[in-house]
């Protein structure tokens, strides 16, 4: 007999009783189209299912849990927490094949959102789902709506009907300063000088501290002090960038990302070089599909430009949860935690 306290504990059978439909499982593998499934990419996989099928049912969640080797409960908790996932369970019907999201936040309310919703509901009579949603960050062009991924400024029934009739569901990409134009105007010169040591990292931090630049998330924490604290942390060091702005009237991030994205990307690389970052996560709210398209494209160009010498960058997509603008909730989303927020005591804004 083994000595007391020296026995091996049986492996926990988390997935016992799971009935996986092989056809659904194979379909998900083809749909998601990757070799190695990652637990922390659960939300990304749920987005693929939602985008391509239009809803997420119990068979999808069971198969996804099997592919990730996690419990069905974990998948269900994550899928049902975020508003942009349509989860179908026993007793609930599938949503209409097309959804029009109409912002009913303050700016849009004042510019006719209620009338627009009424007109759409009267015209489509249940054949298209008309959904009231919180601020989508297009307050300057209220009332605003989205038809799948097509963002509609100064929306009215005629505009939305034309989009639906023409099946113009992709995001409309605005004109913006691309990488070559940005480089011709001196872009990435500062980053290159810091990376090669022509400009010392300590002098960058000192300049940042002297500028008194502060975070805009509410606490107003000095950016230079935050960088300095992080430089003293043990490695590996991870960089999480919060591009969520759900407050009505707030769309500063969308404005510069849709007009001058490389100014943001160079700032990201400067910070990563000074602080010696190992990996970067960009959390982008799901309400900005055009920005997502721009960043995916320009990040690819950026990696080629610097011969893959920049840190690994993961662009992560939100799913309609206002709370993820808060730092610990954002980090929980990056980990794909079923819990929307870390309820531990507040820490310095440079640690997680």
Regions found by a protein language model. Give the residues of each.
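Conserved small/polar residues in nucleotide/adenosyl-binding loops
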Residues: 335-342
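Iron-sulfur (Fe-S) cluster-binding segments and ferredoxin-like electron-carrier domains
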Residues: 98-100, 106-124, 140-164, 224-233
């Amino acid at each position: 007999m083994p000595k007391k306290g020296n026995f091996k504990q049986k492996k926990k059978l988390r997935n016992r009783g799971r009935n996986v439909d092989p056809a659904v499982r194979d379909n998900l593998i083809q749909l998601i189209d990757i070799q190695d499934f990652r637990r922390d990419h659960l939300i990304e996989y749920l987005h693929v299912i939602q985008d391509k099928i239009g809803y997420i049912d119990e068979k999808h969640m069971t198969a996804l849990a099997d592919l990730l080797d996690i419990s069905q409960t974990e998948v269900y908790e994550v899928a049902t927490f975020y508003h942009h996932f349509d989860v179908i369970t026993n007793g609930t019907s599938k949503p209409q094949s097309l959804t029009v999201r109409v912002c009913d936040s303050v700016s849009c309310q004042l510019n006719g959102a209620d009338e627009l919703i009424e007109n759409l509901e009267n015209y489509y009579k249940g054949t298209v789902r008309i959904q009231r949603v919180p601020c989508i960050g297009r307050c300057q062009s209220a009332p605003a709506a989205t038809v799948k991924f097509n963002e509609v400024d100064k929306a009215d029934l005629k505009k939305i009907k034309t989009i639906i009739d023409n099946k113009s569901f992709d995001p409309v990409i605005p004109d913006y300063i691309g990488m070559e134009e940005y480089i011709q105007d001196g872009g990435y010169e500062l980053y290159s000088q810091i990376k090669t040591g022509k400009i010392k990292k300590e002098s960058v931090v000192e300049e940042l501290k002297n500028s008194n630049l502060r975070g805009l998330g509410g606490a107003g924490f000095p950016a230079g002090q935050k960088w300095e604290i992080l430089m003293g942390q043990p490695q590996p060091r991870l960089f999480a960038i919060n591009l969520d702005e759900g407050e009505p009237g707030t769309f500063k991030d969308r404005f510069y990302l849709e007009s001058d994205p490389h100014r943001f990307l160079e700032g990201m690389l400067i910070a990563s070089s000074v602080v010696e970052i190992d990996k970067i996560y960009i959390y982008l709210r799901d309400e900005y599909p055009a920005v997502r398209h721009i960043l995916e494209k320009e990040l690819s160009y950026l990696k080629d430009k610097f011969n893959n010498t920049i840190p690994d960058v993961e662009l992560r997509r939100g799913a309609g949860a206002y709370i993820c603008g808060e730092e610990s909730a954002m980090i929980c989303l990056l980990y794909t935690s079923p819990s929307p927020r870390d309820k531990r005591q507040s820490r310095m804004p440079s640690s997680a």
